[in-house]
Amino acid sequence: MARVKMITPEEADAQTRKVYQGVIEQWGRISNFSKVLAHQPAALEGWMLPNEMIRLANIKSDPDYVKIQQLVIIKTSALNQSAYCMSHNVPLGTKIGLTAEQVAAAQGDDYMSSPALDARQKAAVRWADAVTRMTAHDDDVAFAEMKKHFTEQQIVELTVFCGMWNYSNRLCEALHVDLEHPDKRIEFQSK
């Protein structure tokens, strides 16, 4: 059971209801994470902006890049053992085309030798591993691989997603955010 009350749409103030409308437009429903974060509507709104402007904006234009974003999110959440974030992001990843083998490789420690991941995916997962373990500062080899496969903008974006999910993983675990039933989880919405 969550350590703080989850704010339902019926209980929400006008500002939060407006933010919730944006959540529904992005994800089709209001997750328990959003209901907890709604105690601070500005934080929830701040969470939504990069999702909309970076993640969802690429769904149709660059689905392979969205798969890489999902691998970064899955690796980060696996390292942090966040059952909540994994319960949403593994299904999101498979719905956009990640294979079970790719998801398993990203979650494990031997991803660099996995035939399921291509060089670009391995570079991103390795970077997420380094950022999450706080070793990226000194990992010039991992950064060189990122530079080989991604623009500087994409490197920043993938690092932002890793940071965002380190934040959400910790928030969900610290506040015991309740898992939704599988048929109540978020889904990418078409733009």
Where are these regions (language model features)?
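Mobile cap/lid helix-loop segments that border enzyme active or cofactor-binding sites
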Residues: 1-63, 189-191
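Preference for long, well-ordered alpha-helical segments
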Residues: 152-189
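Acidic/His metal-coordination segments adjacent to aromatic residues that form catalytic metal sites
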Residues: 106-119
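Alpha-helical scaffold segments that form or flank carboxylate-/histidine-based iron centers
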Residues: 32-39, 65-80, 156-159
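Short acidic alpha-helix initiation/capping motifs at coil-to-helix transition points
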Residues: 24-25, 46, 81-85, 123, ...
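Short, thiol/selenol-centered motifs that function as redox-active sites or metal-ligating centers
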Residues: 69-92, 165
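Iron-sulfur (Fe-S) cluster-binding segments and ferredoxin-like electron-carrier domains
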Residues: 44, 88-105
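Acidic/histidine-rich alpha-helical segments that form the ligand environment
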Residues: 116-160
